[in-house]
Regions:
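NAD(P)-dinucleotide binding in Rossmann-like oxidoreductases
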Residues: 207-212, 221-288
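Beta-loop-alpha module in the N-terminal Rossmann-like domain of NAD(P)-dependent dehydrogenases
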Residues: 36, 47-107
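Hydrophobic residues in well-ordered beta-strands that form the structural core
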Residues: 53, 92-93, 117-119, 257
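Short, Asp-centered acidic motifs that coordinate Mg2+ and/or phosphate
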Residues: 31, 66, 143
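N-terminal Rossmann-like dinucleotide-binding module
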Residues: 1-46
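Rossmann-like dinucleotide-binding domain that binds NAD(P)(H)
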Residues: 161-241, 307-311
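C-terminal helix-rich "cap/oligomerization" subdomain common to oxidoreductases
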Residues: 1, 59, 66-68, 115, ...
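A contiguous active-site-proximal alpha/beta segment in oxidoreductase catalytic domains
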Residues: 97-156
Length: 326
């Protein structure tokens, strides 16, 4: 039996982790914590477990084997440092902090202590990526283009995460929240440690907040050119909650995703097929949760950890600087 705790449970992503973990066999949720004690108490009552306002008090009291750590982005480094020092394995919600140096320091500390520290860069575990790599891993990628425009930021006010609209707490807007997945993919597929920011544009014109509500970025990873376009602009609260389009080109294939569940694959000879596959992050959190706990028990490394998050955050720092947001 794995004893699991959740901290920062007012985070709007909590259901993406909590619901899959609740369904896993041989897992017991022993406690939750949040700076808002009412939220912690409400979640704990539903789970029948302990609650605390201070995650350090909770960890000392329930002594979990594994922690899913969420919370405000600015608070994440302190959470991770505590868990590393306490010798508690954990998965830390991205972006793990609000700057590259912060997350790089966490990666250094975790590696020095031999800590199990996973980060849910879940598109690395996606069927979308598996299908592309199965066909094109040996070809190399010429162009990678990812567009995902999400809903307006007022949703964070109604979901109990108003801090997401404040740059000092969130570190940024759509780029650090949504774009980080695609920046990580470009770095991963481009297979280069040297990522160059060729151009970056950010804007807060739509909502006049301290965070960007739109960004357009061009990167170079080796010989691969990658673009990321993201924002908080799409006016929908329904199932079709995003405006998205991916395009990926290799010498032998061209891939297009126009929605969250299909991938169009064309060969260089003009043969095209469409396959059913999840293309966005949301559908892959159950897989991440089961896999990260399995890897923890088996003493295997996570698919992505703080070092990978630090690389993405370092690129984001360069992007924000080029785009005039820092």
């Amino acid at each position: 039996m794995i004893n699991v705790a959740f901290i920062g449970v007012s985070h709007w992503h909590l259901p993406l982790y909590l619901n899959p973990v609740r369904a896993l066999p041989d897992v017991r949720i022993v406690g939750v914590a949040d700076p808002d004690p009412a939220v912690a108490a409400r979640v704990a009552a539903d789970l029948g477990c302990e609650s605390a306002e201070d995650y350090r008090d909770l960890i000392a009291r329930v002594r979990p084997d594994f922690v899913f750590a969420l919370g405000e982005h600015a608070d994440m480094p302190a959470e991770a440092e505590y868990l590393i020092d306490a010798g508690v394995a954990f998965a830390l919600e991205k972006p793990c902090g609000i700057s590259g140096p912060q997350v790089t320091s966490l990666a250094d500390q975790a590696e020095k202590k031999g800590a199990f520290a996973a980060v849910p860069l879940v598109l690395r575990q996606s069927d979308f990526l598996t299908e592309i790599e199965r066909r094109s891993a040996d070809e190399g990628y010429t162009y990678l283009s990812f567009k995902l425009i999400g809903r307006p930021p007022d949703r964070y006010l109604t979901e109990g995460s108003a801090w997401m609209t404040e740059c000092s707490a969130a570190g940024g807007g759509a780029l650090i929240n949504l774009g980080i997945h695609y920046i990580d993919l470009i770095a991963c597929l481009g297979k280069s440690d040297d990522i160059e920011v060729l151009a970056a544009t950010t804007s807060a014109a739509a909502w006049n907040l301290s965070i960007e509500d739109y960004a357009l970025v061009t990167l170079r990873a080796g010989t691969t050119i990658g673009t990321v376009e993201t924002g908080y602009l799409y006016p929908s609260s329904g199932e079709a909650y995003m405006d998205m389009h991916y395009s990926l080109r290799t010498p032998g294939h061209y891939y297009v995703a126009r929605d969250s569940s299909h991938l169009e694959v064309s060969t260089s000879s003009g043969v095209t097929e469409t396959i059913d596959v999840g293309t966005t992050n949301i559908s892959y959190y159950p897989r991440f949760c089961a896999d990260v706990l399995r890897r923890f028990v088996a003493s295997e490394k996570p698919v992505a950890g703080l070092r990978e998050a630090a690389r993405a955050m370092t690129i984001l720092d360069d992007v924000y600087q080029a785009g005039g947001r820092r």
